[in-house]
Structures are given as structure tokens and as C-alpha cells.
């Protein structure tokens, strides 16, 4: 199948119908159906990627896997790194908000930027085992080691995508405080600062990598999140059978995709 003409929304519809393995399945294959589909899509884009396998204690019978893609690495400018976790908690759910919509945004960005002249290095990481909620043994922790080892050169900030399928309002969160290097990007996004549950940006921050998390909310959920009235309804879909494709907005995803591309320049 040729995926070149598909948007993030189109790819999300494909993933929503794909049965795969939970991140907690100790006997899952290295290349789960979800990860194999990502690999297939990247192949369709004719994009080179690096595979990083790693072991999680307690899950020694399987490998977990990060995928890395980089563009314009010859530039001396500080780069941006976008990431999203591809693993899932509930294999019976369509997992559209958590977190396949974000993976599909990453894939569309890769498709769009691969042949563009870029002003700075742009990197992508599609990471594993976020659902384990472990600051010291997950895909983003492995990513932090690779960042410190120079895999991606100098980075201005890492932008973690979560819950990006519905809403016109952009939110951002960070662990304890936003790194100074995030401020320019936050201003360009006109984003609302909120508090969120555990995510990969928190892991990166704990390991001394400048990072923030970004997503979108509708009017009602934005008010809840900004004013700390409770838990936004959209976030409550995570891990549930209600996290379905019919709750996703094609228009909102398209708008958010353009916003993501705008901060790459």
C-alpha cells in the first residue's frame, strides 16, 4: 500500500483497525503489528531510520523498540526533536488519543519534511514502553541516554506529542518548570500551560534533557485543564474502550499538523 498521499487522520483510521499487543504483554514479538505498520509506512516514504532495541527488567523475553529519524544533520544550528510513544496499554482499545494520533502526526511530519530545505536539524523519535510509567526504564529514558551520547547533536528542546486527535486549543506541560529553551516555542504556539499526568517529556526532564509535552483540547476540556476543575474528558479516554476513531476530528488534526510544521522553521 502507498501511504504517501495519506494524512495523519487517514493513517490513524488504518491503525484504529489494527489489533496489536499491550506494552505489558511479556511474550509480544519485537515487531508488533503496530510497530510493523510504522516500519511499512516509513518504507513507503523512502525514509531511513535507526532501530534501537532495549530490554525492560521483568520483560526479558521480548525487546522493546525505539525508531529514530533525522533530517538536515549537517546544520550547525540547535535542533528540534519531536517524539511520541507507540506502545499501548489496552490491546482491546483503538487507542486513538493515546497515543496513535500523535504517532500519525509524527509520520505525516516525516513525509512532509523529508525533501524540504530546513533551517535546522529536525529529529523524530517514536518510542516504546511509555505505558509502564517508569522514569528509569522506558523508551524516552533510552532516548535521553542517546541524546547525552551525541546521537542528535545539540538540541534546543524535545517536543513530546500526547493526546492530539481532538481540539483547537494547544496546551503544553513540563516537569516542575519549563526549560528556558522552551519559551520561544511556547510563545509561537500561543499555548496554554497546564498540568498533566506522567508522560515522556517528564522522563526526559528528569534525565536533564530540555523537554515539554504538547497536545490539543476542545473548549470545554481546556477550561477544565487550565482552571484545574478536574480531569479533561479527552484525557479520560486513555486506556479505555471509548478511545475510538469516531471521537477524532479530521479538521483539528489537520490544523495541528500545520502548527507542528510551523515550528520547524
Predicted regions located by residue number:
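Soluble non-cytosolic domains of exported or imported proteins
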Residues: 5, 9, 25-36, 96-104, ...
Amino acid at each position: 500500500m502507498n501511504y504517501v498521499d495519506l494524512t495523519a487522520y487517514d493513517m490513524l483510521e488504518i491503525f484504529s483497525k489494527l489489533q496489536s499487543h499491550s506494552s505489558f504483554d511479556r511474550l509480544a514479538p519485537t515487531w508488533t503489528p503496530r510497530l510493523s505498520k510504522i516500519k511499512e509506512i516509513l518504507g513507503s516514504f523512502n525514509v531511513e531510520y535507526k532501530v534501537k532495541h532495549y530490554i525492560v527488567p521483568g520483560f526479558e523475553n521480548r525487546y522493546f523498540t525505539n525508531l529514530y529519524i533525522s533530517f538536515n544533520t549537517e546544520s550547525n544550528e540547535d535542533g528540534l526533536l519531536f517524539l511520541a510513544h507507540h506502545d499501548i496499554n489496552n490491546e482491546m482499545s483503538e487507542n486513538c488519543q493515546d497515543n496513535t494520533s500523535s504517532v500519525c502526526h509524527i509520520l505525516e511530519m516525516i513525509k512532509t519534511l523529508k525533501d524540504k530545505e530546513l533551517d535546522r536539524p529536525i529529529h523524530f523519535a517514536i518510542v516504546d514502553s511509555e505505558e509502564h510509567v517508569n522514569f528509569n526504564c522506558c523508551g524516552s529514558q533510552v532516548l535521553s541516554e542517546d541524546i547525552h551520547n551525541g546521537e542528535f547533536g545539540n538540541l534546543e528542546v524535545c517536543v513530546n506529542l500526547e493526546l492530539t486527535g481532538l481540539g483547537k486549543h494547544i496546551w503544553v506541560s513540563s516537569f516542575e518548570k519549563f526549560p528556558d529553551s522552551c519559551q520561544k516555542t511556547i510563545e509561537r504556539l500561543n499555548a496554554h500551560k497546564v498540568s498533566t499526568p506522567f508522560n515522556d517529556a517528564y522522563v526526559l526532564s528528569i534525565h536533564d534533557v530540555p523537554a515539554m509535552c504538547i497536545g490539543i483540547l476542545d473548549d470545554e476540556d481546556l477550561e477544565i485543564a487550565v482552571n484545574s476543575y478536574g480531569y479533561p474528558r479527552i484525557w479520560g479516554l486513555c486506556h479505555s474502550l471509548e478511545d475510538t476513531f469516531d471521537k477524532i476530528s479530521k479538521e483539528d488534526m489537520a490544523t495541528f499538523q500545520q502548527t507542528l510544521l510551523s515550528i520547524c522553521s
